[in-house]
């Protein structure tokens, strides 16, 4: 459960002495007239600011447009917005994590070019004829078009919270060798454990070439919606970094966050210190319903990729004396168990419009397909509610053609061949 916090709207009840919670989803208010308009990602991050734009009509994913800029005063961090017919995706890249190219620039240890960065995070574009757009009027077109299309792909952070933990500073320090069986069972239930190396489906901005984001993650698909989870306990862990900056960089970009809470005390909706986070889905196992689990899950060594570094003793309760393989999380969703139940509470920033489906009363679910489908639908509904009034209309053909029209228009003018 969430505690009351100014600036947030809670679904599933608050813990300020209420014995019954009130579902404040109002179907009649779930329309565009009452939705507060939120600035698009492009307008927030790129419009009117120093950046570069590249495009191509012929990539493996069809027409593609990429906006890229340096982050702050550093020349080592880059922020990208990748736009295709399928949707819009934010990607953050660091110079040290980029694929090393055998060029004069790399030998001289010069900073990578924008094209180096793009082809490193999107290797499939290496042989694509990307052109740089020099006509600044494209910004006016893109500010109307570049609004995330959430109904096809979603990336969501997934954090594990222990009994004594209260915010992301604590949760980002958790490692997979020191989590509960209930948490591992939930990962098993939520989706498929996939190897990131050369992963061909939606990767959610995770590194699929150099394992800089770990070796595995959790992926799921329902109908035509793909979901990639940024699972904090599966990301590399650096004992020398108390803030776990690399984990934070990735997760801080996610608008939708799932927290699996093993604790019994209420959590504050502002437990995630990121302006990007708009929706938090808090899932708490009801342990009275948990039977003896027969699922066997090993210990992941994803977070121990850095040679010579081991988890801090303060973060572990057991000592592993033998080398173990990655968790045996089933590659396919297991047969649901009715012995486990979950209580769900959802925190939304006040500016997030209402969205469905509403939580049931009481907000308790059995571990079954209905609960899994509810989570997917809630993430899709929440992510879609974050959109500004988009240039994309409700028809799928018009959604795709909006971006194609911009790329086609500027492919004949204001272009600089790379």
From Swiss-Prot:
One GO CC term, this protein: cytoplasm
Pfam hit, one: Rap_GAP
Changes seen on gene knockout: Null cells have increased levels of active rap1, increased substrate adhesion, abnormal F-actin distribution, show defects in cell-cell and substrate adhesion during aggregation and vegetative growth.
GO biological process: actin filament organization; cell-substrate adhesion; regulation of cell-cell adhesion; regulation of myosin II filament assembly; regulation of small GTPase mediated signal transduction; small GTPase-mediated signal transduction; sorocarp stalk cell differentiation; sorocarp stalk development
Rap-GAP domain mapped to chain residues: 142-407
Region called Disordered, residue ranges: 304-339
Biased composition range(s): Low complexity: 311-338
Keywords: GTPase activation
GO terms, molecular function: enzyme regulator activity; GTPase activator activity
SUPFAM superfamilies per UniProt: Rap/Ran-GAP
Source organism superkingdom: Eukaryota
Protein task: Mediates the deactivation of rap1 during multicellular development and is required for normal morphogenesis. Also required for the correct patterning of specific subtypes of prestalk cells.
Name used for this protein in its record: RapA guanosine triphosphatase-activating protein B
């Amino acid at each position: 459960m969430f505690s009351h916090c100014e600036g947030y709207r809670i679904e599933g009840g608050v813990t300020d002495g209420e014995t019954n919670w009130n579902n404040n989803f109002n179907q009649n208010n779930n329309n565009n007239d009452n939705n507060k308009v939120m600035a698009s990602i492009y307008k927030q991050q790129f419009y009117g600011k120093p950046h570069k734009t590249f495009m191509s009509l012929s990539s493996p994913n069809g027409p593609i447009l990429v906006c890229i800029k340096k982050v702050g005063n550093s020349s080592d961090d880059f922020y990208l917005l990748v736009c295709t017919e399928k949707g819009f995706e934010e990607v953050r890249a660091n110079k040290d994590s980029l694929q090393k190219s055998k060029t004069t620039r790399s030998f001289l240890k010069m900073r990578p070019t924008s094209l180096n960065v793009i082809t490193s995070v999107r290797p499939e574009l290496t042989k694509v004829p990307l052109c740089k757009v020099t006509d600044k009027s494209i910004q006016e077109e893109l500010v109307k078009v570049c609004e995330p299309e959430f109904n096809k792909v979603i990336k969501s952070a997934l954090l594990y919270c222990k009994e004594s933990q209260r915010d992301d500073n604590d949760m980002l320090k958790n490692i997979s060798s020191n989590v509960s069986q209930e948490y591992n069972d939930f990962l098993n239930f939520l989706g498929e454990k996939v190897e990131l190396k050369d992963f061909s489906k939606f990767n959610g901005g995770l590194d699929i070439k150099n394992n800089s984001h770990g070796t595995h993650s959790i992926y799921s698909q329902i109908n035509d919606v793909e979901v990639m989870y940024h699972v904090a306990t599966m990301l590399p862990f650096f004992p020398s970094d108390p803030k776990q900056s690399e984990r934070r960089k990735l997760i801080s970009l996610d608008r939708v966050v799932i927290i699996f809470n093993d604790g019994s005390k209420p959590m504050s909706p502002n437990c995630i210190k990121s302006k990007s986070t708009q929706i938090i889905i808090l899932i708490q196992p009801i342990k009275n319903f948990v039977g003896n689990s027969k699922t066997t899950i090993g210990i992941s060594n994803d977070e121990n990729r850095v040679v010579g570094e081991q988890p801090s003793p303060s973060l572990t309760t057991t000592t592993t004396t033998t080398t173990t393989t990655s968790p045996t999380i089933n590659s396919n969703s297991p047969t649901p168990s009715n012995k486990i139940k979950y209580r769900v509470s959802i925190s939304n920033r006040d500016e997030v419009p209402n969205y469905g489906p509403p939580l049931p009363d009481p907000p308790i679910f059995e571990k079954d397909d209905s609960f899994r489908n509810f989570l997917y639908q809630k993430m899709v509904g929440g992510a879609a509610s974050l959109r500004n009034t988009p240039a994309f209309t409700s028809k799928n053909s018009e959604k795709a053609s909006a971006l194609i029209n911009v790329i086609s228009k500027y492919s004949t003018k204001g272009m600089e061949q790379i």
